């Protein structure tokens, strides 16, 4: 018979809590957690009890959050602690495990024995062994140490913090660069990149190792193969320094790798951000992406993608529209105006959307303005002004409205989506 658990406080008291197993027959049996097994912070059953300097026992996760918030006192006694060290309370932990096992004949799940958190000394030792193995070119030993870091990171957030704070990031970057020209080191490089994603931000020395030609070549190879960690790491590197962007654009086949990457859900957003950084650098990069049909692919993304993807795609289109060649490509896509009009009030970040529409309409032959007007853009843009937007966006919206107003007067066009009953409060009409 299946058994589920519900937790409730008795009479609103914070000192007592009940666990109520509910059987499929709706029979309830109440079990009160002994007060000595409850964490004084959360009043929940302790899974990893530790003693602090005041002599009070807490659940490790809760007391660590307390210390990380800047407190250096005992939550119960309010005394200032001379040390923030946490010592496992094995006696209480064994008592809790025994109580869990005996309650309801084992109906309450027994808490597992917690792993001892890694120490700074242990992390330093792992880093030293990884550095030595890297210098020797010992693939197996490097794989062992990187895998050990991965395992430590999976065990707890505290472990991740300890690994990061004890120099692992630089050692991993050096290892990646050292094996980047080894065609048989793919597994090691994948694992290294995976760990590096929670080592950010990477220092200047580490960045210099990850942005060498050989390192970038391997990161692009991982990206091409669908590695989402590589997509994330590349994006982070490009956001740190424009020189990394210039270095990446020189890598053979990088544009093709990103075009492949934006078609995968797991790597799409990070890859769009990276493309945005790349096309900001020079005309040659923009031209290459245009040859690879970036405009049509990003426009298609706007049709039914999530808002986060749409916003990044619009950012890319906005930069593309800075060039004459790019604007022409965007204008020739028949979906552009309908999609832009449809999305005006549907996405939260509208700056790039308005900018793309403004650039397309301003550089077009007037047909784009007429189409936008016919699809109801006028009313939506007025609503944008009503709600409020940034000064630069407001100027573009106002200019778009002037263009549309001019077309309406010249052609006797009536925007049938425009309702005279709408109250345009707080909107000055310069159009």
From Swiss-Prot:
A GO biological-process term: protein ubiquitination
For the U-box domain, which residue ranges apply? 32-106
Q: Which UniProt keywords apply?
A: Transferase, Ubl conjugation pathway
Q: What is this protein called?
A: U-box domain-containing protein 20
Q: Which organism is this entry from?
A: Arabidopsis thaliana (Mouse-ear cress)
EC number(s)?
2.3.2.27
Q: In which pathway does it act?
A: Protein modification; protein ubiquitination
What function does the entry list? Functions as an E3 ubiquitin ligase.
Which GO terms fall under molecular function for this chain's record? ubiquitin protein ligase activity
Name the InterPro entries on file: ARM-like (IPR011989), ARM-type_fold (IPR016024), PUB22/23/24-like (IPR045185), RING-Ubox_PUB (IPR045210), Ubox_domain (IPR003613), Znf_RING/FYVE/PHD (IPR013083)
Q: Broadest EC class?
A: transferase
Name the reaction it catalyses.
S-ubiquitinyl-[E2 ubiquitin-conjugating enzyme]-L-cysteine + [acceptor protein]-L-lysine = [E2 ubiquitin-conjugating enzyme]-L-cysteine + N(6)-ubiquitinyl-[acceptor protein]-L-lysine
């Amino acid at each position: 018979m299946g058994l589920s658990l519900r937790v409730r406080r008795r009479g609103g008291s914070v000192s007592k809590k009940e666990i109520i197993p509910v059987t499929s027959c709706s029979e309830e049996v109440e079990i009160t957690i002994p007060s000595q097994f409850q964490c004084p912070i959360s009043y929940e059953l302790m899974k990893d009890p530790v003693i602090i300097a005041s002599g009070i026992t807490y659940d490790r996760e809760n007391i660590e959050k307390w210390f990380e918030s800047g407190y250096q006192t005992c939550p119960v006694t309010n005394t200032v602690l001379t040390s923030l060290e946490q010592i496992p309370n094995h006696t209480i932990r064994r008592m809790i495990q025994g109580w869990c096992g005996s309650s309801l004949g084992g109906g309450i799940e027994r808490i597992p024995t917690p792993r001892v958190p890694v120490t700074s000394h242990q992390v330093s030792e792992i880093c030293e062994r990884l550095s030595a193995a890297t210098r020797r070119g010992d693939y197996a030993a490097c794989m062992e140490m990187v895998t050990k870091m991965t395992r430590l990171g999976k065990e707890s957030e505290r472990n991740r913090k300890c690994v990061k704070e004890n120099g692992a990031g630089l050692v991993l970057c050096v290892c990646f660069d050292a094996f980047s020209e080894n065609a048989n080191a793919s597994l090691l490089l994948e694992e290294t990149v995976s760990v590096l994603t929670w080592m950010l931000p990477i220092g200047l020395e580490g960045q210099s190792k990850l942005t060498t030609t050989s390192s970038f070549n391997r990161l692009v190879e991982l990206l091409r193969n669908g590695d989402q960690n590589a997509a994330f790491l590349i994006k982070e590197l490009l956001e740190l320094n424009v020189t990394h962007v210039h270095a990446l654009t020189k890598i053979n086949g990088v544009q093709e790798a990103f075009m492949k990457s934006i078609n995968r859900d797991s790597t799409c957003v990070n890859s769009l951000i990276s493309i945005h950084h790349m096309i900001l650098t020079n005309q040659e990069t923009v031209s290459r992406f245009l040859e690879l049909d970036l405009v049509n692919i990003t426009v298609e993304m706007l049709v039914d993608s999530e808002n986060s993807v749409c916003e990044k795609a619009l950012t890319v289109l906005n930069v593309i529209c800075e060039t004459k060649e790019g604007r022409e490509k965007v204008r020739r896509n028949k979906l552009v105006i309908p999609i832009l009009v449809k999305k005006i009030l549907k996405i939260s970040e509208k700056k790039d959307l308005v900018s793309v529409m403004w650039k397309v309409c301003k550089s077009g032959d007037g047909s784009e303005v007429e189409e936008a007007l016919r699809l109801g853009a006028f009313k939506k843009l007025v609503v944008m002004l009503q709600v409020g937007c940034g000064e630069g966006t407001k100027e573009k919206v106002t200019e778009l409205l002037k263009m549309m107003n001019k077309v309406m007067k010249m052609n006797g066009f009536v925007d049938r989506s425009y309702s005279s009953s709408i109250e345009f409060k707080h909107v000055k009409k310069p159009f």
